[in-house]
């Protein structure tokens, strides 16, 4: 059911569509069709598990930004940045993040916040769909929406969306610990770098609260180990060759050295320090490897485990063809 005072479903969809155009201009869509389809498939699977979808269509997009961020717009638009994709360590974590953003949409957090801040302009538009005649007014609304998405929606709304994301991802067959795992590794990253994910700052008093609540809810829902149904390797295989760092948005004119994410299979006898030395030429990069892979500094990698590593330069696909054993002959 649609429940935002003074706003019709059509208006809410139009608000999202207007701001979507600005986001696409501001960041650009990451040009990797296979990865876009992969994220969209996970997102649409989550939407299919909702008891009430609220909106007829949902869109999931990776935007070309090195910021660590995910955000949603009214009407069914969900975005994750390249920076966030690089931080995520399993499909279950990504499902938790996408489910959280779907929560913002179905609870109308963005639209309600807009009504509180610029309700009079939205009311003046009524149900009018964007057209050249009222383009100026729509621009005001979509600009305000664009500015607000990065500010988060306050403690209650974030926890409500965390819960929705955990429930939704579990219904879609994922470990409910994905969300808390992602929040924990993000907190480690933020403590190191001071970078923040929307409404999730290391200095924010509610950060630990969110991690604890997400972990408790997941624990109540599942008696399995934390890494059950995480689909970590499946996610990491998709990530190989992902552009790393680079521009924050279209206004970022700095020259960025090309870097990408590679996937390394741990060998017998490897430690994080030895991998850092062997693969990156600097054993002090071991901390970077543990943080990026959501691991505690005190832990050690296990043989056969896959790890993300950052490499300089542009990604080159394997030169060798992977021939599958015993190919099935075509039916005559």
Sequence positions of predicted segments:
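Acidic helix-start/capping segments at beta-turn-to-alpha-helix junctions
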Residues: 31-46, 58-65, 120-123, 182-189
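Short pre-active-site segment immediately N-terminal to the catalytic Zn-binding motif
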Residues: 79-96, 111, 151-156
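Catalytic zinc-binding patch centered on the HExxH motif and its immediate surroundings
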Residues: 62-76
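Active-site His/Glu-centered metal-binding helix of metallohydrolases
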Residues: 19, 98-110, 160, 164
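Catalytic Zn2+-binding segment of zinc metalloproteases
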Residues: 91-92, 102-118, 130-131
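Extracytoplasmic and endomembrane cell-envelope/extracellular-matrix remodeling and assembly machinery
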Residues: 2-8, 17, 21, 25, ...
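Short alpha-helical functional segments enriched in proximate histidine and acidic residues
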Residues: 46, 104-105, 168
